[in-house]
Curated annotation (Swiss-Prot):
Membrane-spanning segments: 16-36, 53-73, 82-102, 114-134
Family, as annotated: Belongs to the UPF0756 family.
Entry-linked Pfam families: DUF441
Topology term for the membrane: Multi-pass membrane protein
GO CC list: plasma membrane
Localisation per UniProt entry: Cell membrane
Span of the signal peptide: none
Keywords from the named record: Cell membrane, Membrane, Transmembrane, Transmembrane helix
First-listed, main subcellular location of the protein, grouped into a coarse class: membrane
Listed name of the protein: UPF0756 membrane protein SG1722
Length: 150
């Protein structure tokens, strides 16, 4: 490992932030990237860069939809969500957050320079404010509202 490689130093720094903030998701993700970077698997980075976000969103969607698919969240519960004002508000907020996430994906794809800032901000939010590490896509969506998507 070449410790004078700035990319490795950045990844190690982000991994350290993940460890310090007890953000296992960030820590594991960075460590996987380090393993890829330091092994012959490095040749797969173009594929990871092109498909990684899409695969991650697919896995996230599977996790969100699993309670419906397994029957834990019944069809009647889903249908009743259209009858209560809190559930209707949750639907509206879910639509808004999904829209923001979509803007975030576009921004992160078109302006990769913001990804590190979003990641550091998310890790700091977890470490300093007891936040939850679910924010980079939504944060990117909010950022896109402020700075534009190009």
């Amino acid at each position: 490992m070449n410790f004078s490689d700035p990319t490795l130093l950045i990844l190690l720094g982000l991994a350290a932030l993940g460890i310090i903030s007890h953000n296992n998701i960030v820590t594991v993700a960075i460590l996987v990237l380090l393993i890829i970077r330091l092994t012959p698997m490095e040749q797969y980075f173009p594929w990871v860069e092109k498909q990684g976000l899409t695969i991650g969103i697919i896995i996230l969607t599977i996790g969100v939809m699993a309670p419906i698919a397994s029957g834990t969240l019944s069809a009647s519960t889903v249908l009743h969500s259209f009858l209560h004002w809190k559930s209707l508000l949750a639907i509206v907020i879910g639509v808004a957050v999904s829209w923001l996430g979509g803007r975030g994906v576009s921004l992160m794809s078109s302006q990769p320079s913001v990804v590190a800032g979003l990641l550091v901000g998310t890790v700091l939010g977890v470490a300093l404010f007891r936040g939850v590490p679910v924010g980079p896509l939504i944060a990117a969506g909010l950022l896109s509202l402020l700075v534009g998507n190009t």
